[in-house]
């Protein structure tokens, strides 16, 4: 007959075994913990090209010849390459639809978002019966099976198409025209508000993005040009995401060298305030690495 101590021990061991088995089948996000321990090995991918099927190797995707641009599904086989290199996190460039009006090039910039809560049809394979969202979920699940966490890029601005649909979301200049940030002519500056008055319409736009990426199983977000939103805006959004997933990682594109807004009409939030708002880290200005031999700081 088992003593009560042995019985408790047996039940405890069974409980631990069951918990381990469940963890083996259900992905548990641990990205913030990994990142803060400096254990994340992050690799950036552009899904639109990552798995592209250029059969004749001419550098051009000929759809008429059965070739296919990069999609969620044809990217999956290449995840094995990343796992073999011990990559444990991928930063996926934006998966939102690309604006067509005033687009740059034939495909348009991935950062010219025409919607923040739907998936870019360019990344969806028409060779599968799965829906766009189901294909995205499958990609994330396959990454997780290989021990790879997934960060999704959050565009900073809206496309001209989105401005035409919802002009109230955008900053306007003195003449009432939407503001072009920096020299990014295919996008317009979103009006996220100020530290004392967050624009709830833009907040809800971004909240919809958070809901979408969490619903496909992603583990974090990289915020493009995070400096042009108020810290209060980010804090509310980050806090919201962590009510759904406490381990949800937030990375800001920012830098100690960034000291000016992208437009006279834009907000500027320095990197230290972004960290106070809840970002786990920041990075930017990698183009300055080439100056390391001559730099003094």
Feature locations, PLM:
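Active-site-adjacent "subsite" loops/lids of carbohydrate-active enzymes
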Residues: 162-218, 226-227
